[in-house]
Every structure is written in C-alpha cells, then in structure tokens.
Amino acid sequence: MKAIMLVNFCDERGSGR
C-alpha cells in the first residue's frame, strides 16, 4: 500500500510540474 501512495504522490508532482 505504501508503493501506491508513493506512486500517486510522484505522479501528481510529476504531472503537475
């Protein structure tokens, strides 16, 4: 479940920027 959170965070940050 931690991987999902990390992926979501990275995805949101990467996509946002």
From Swiss-Prot:
Q: What happens when the gene is disrupted?
A: Forms multiple, contiguous heterocysts with abnormal short spacing between heterocysts on nitrogen-containing medium. These heterocysts do not have nitrogenase activity. In nitrogen-free medium nearly normal heterocyst patterns are established after 4 days growth.
Q: Main localization of the protein?
A: periplasm
Outcome of mutating S15D: Does not inhibit heterocyst formation
Question: One GO BP annotation here?
Answer: heterocyst development
Q: What is the induction note for this entry?
A: Transcribed at low levels in vegetative cells. Under control of HetR. Transcription and translation rises 3-fold by 6 hours after heterocyst induction by nitrogen reduction (before proheterocysts can be identified), descends to preinduction levels by 27 hours (at protein level).
Look up what happens after changing G16S. Answer: Does not inhibit heterocyst formation
Q: Where in the cell is it found?
A: Periplasm
Per UniProt, the keywords (alphabetical) are: Heterocyst, Periplasm, Transcription, Transcription regulation
* CC annotations in GO: periplasmic space
Classify the source by domain of life. Answer: Bacteria
Q: What is the effect of changing R17L?
A: Does not inhibit heterocyst formation
What is the stated purpose of this protein?
Inhibits heterocyst differentiation; a peptide corresponding to the last 5-6 amino acids blocks heterocyst formation when added exogenously in culture. Controls heterocyst pattern formation through intercellular signaling mechanisms. In Nostoc filaments, approximately every 10th vegetative cell terminally differentiates into a heterocyst specialized for nitrogen fixation. Seems to inhibit the formation of adjacent heterocysts. The C-terminal peptide binds HetR, inhibits hetR transcription and blocks the DNA-binding of HetR.
Quaternary structure note: The C-terminal peptide binds HetR; one peptide binds to each subunit of the HetR homodimer.
Known NCBIfam families for this protein?
heterocyst_PatS (NF047415)
Q: Supply the name of the protein.
A: Transcriptional regulator peptide PatS
This chain is encoded by the gene named: patS
